[in-house]
Amino acid sequence: MDATESNEWFEQNFGDPDVMAIFRGYGVARTLELAERAWAAGIKLVEVPIQSPSDLEALEATAALGAGSGHLVAAGTVTTRAHVDQAKQRGAAFVVSPGLDISIVAECLAAGLPPLPGVSTASELQIALGLGLRWVKVFPAAVLGASWFSILRGPFPEMRFVATGGLTAASAPEFLAAGVRVVAVGSAIENDAELAALAGILSPGS
């Protein structure tokens, strides 16, 4: 896989707008329960951060369940090249990182896993652009604020943003209006009202 193929993969599989659910440290049973809850609400993108052996088990189980129903599961918090291999072995569809590491991007592409590196500055956006990447995670989005996205879209109109970190169902629309393509949330999936609001982003007429 090269950067162009990675960009095409994201364009084909990420909606406009879209929502991604992040399930960190829940263990296998609870992660599966929450993933099914998200999928039932129409949220097809799920990220399982891999920071412990139990996280890897949760990723593998969720990826297997998602594969059977056409849902995409990412390995998140990928901070080493070894994580990339672990993600591939456990069936991850793509890889999400908190920061931008050129060696991890290269490892992902070599493994056939679309990379979604994290950025928070114009310099990092320019590096990602130089690598041929068009899709990035912006973290921590709530700290940066929605205006960050509207301002940075000016010099980087070709970039596609996945806003992550501190977002809620209430704040998500502001970020989408600022040019974000995908909003990523965590505990909001456990709240009925927030889940309904997030589902409404995907089906505004419902």
Which residues does each predicted region cover?
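Conserved functional loop/turn residues at catalytic and ligand-binding sites
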Residues: 42, 91, 99, 112, ...
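Glycine/Thr-rich beta-alpha phosphate-binding loop at enzyme active sites
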Residues: 44-49, 88-90, 111, 121-149, ...
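Conserved N-terminal beta1-alpha1 strand-loop-helix module at the mouth
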Residues: 1-93, 110-111, 168-170, 177, ...
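Catalytic alpha/beta core domains of metabolic enzymes, predominantly
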Residues: 85, 116-122, 126, 131, ...
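Glycine-rich beta-to-alpha transition loops that act as phosphate-gripper elements at the mouths
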Residues: 24-27, 75-81, 97-101, 117-122, ...
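Short beta-strand segments at enzyme active-site cores
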Residues: 46-49, 74, 95-97, 118, ...
